[in-house]
A protein has these predicted regions:
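Short amphipathic alpha-helix used as the core "switch/output" element in two-component signaling
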Residues: 60-75
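Hydrophobic/aromatic residues positioned on beta-strands within the core alpha/beta folds
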Residues: 80-81
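Acidic, metal-coordinating helix/loop segments flanking the phosphotransfer/catalytic sites
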Residues: 18, 31-49
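Two-component/phosphorelay signaling modules centered on CheY-like receiver
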Residues: 10-30
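Acidic di-acidic motifs
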Residues: 8-9, 125
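CheY-like receiver
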Residues: 107, 114-141
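Active-site residues of response regulator receiver
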Residues: 53-54
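A Lys-centered signature of the CheY-like receiver
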Residues: 98
Length: 141
């Protein structure tokens, strides 16, 4: 069972994601809304995957959270944002555009888990999904 931390400033969206993930066999290690809370929860609960909103409740950016994580052994990171062209996303594996469908969030997490485990991303990719690591070996891209 993969452990996921949700970092999202919109509590309704965070609750929706938590319910969806639990229904599909994930363990949700918590919900964070700020940079400090996210980093502390990641270090304490060591999630396998992080759903990381770009804009956080404290005005910070999700990229600031990702930058604080050590590369070896860091969790897989799926950014979620309403404006994918707004900021250069770094230190993550993929990005999913908001609003997203349940099926797209689940598939996006599955792909990020595959990247962490194998270094490869296997299509099909969800609607509004973008790989962020050019070194990722994608079977059909």
């Amino acid at each position: 069972m993969l452990k996921v931390l949700i970092v999202e400033d919109d509590l309704m969206l965070a609750d929706f994601a938590e319910e969806l993930l639990v229904e599909h066999g994930y363990k949700v290690s918590g919900i964070a809304r700020t940079i400090g809370d996210a980093v502390a929860r990641i270090r304490h609960s060591t999630p396998d995957l992080v759903i990381l909103d770009l804009r956080l409740a404290d005005g910070g950016l999700g990229t600031e959270v990702a930058a604080q994580l050590a590369a070896p052994g860091r969790p897989g990171i799926l950014y979620v944002t309403g404006n994918m062209s707004q900021v250069a996303l770094t230190d993550g594996d993929a990005c999913l555009a908001k609003p997203y469908r349940s099926v797209d969030l689940l598939r996006g997490l599955q792909i990020v888990a595959e990247i962490v485990a194998t270094g490869k991303a296997q299509p099909p990719f969800p609607q509004g999904f973008q790989l962020l690591r050019p070194a990722v070996d994608s079977a059909l891209i």
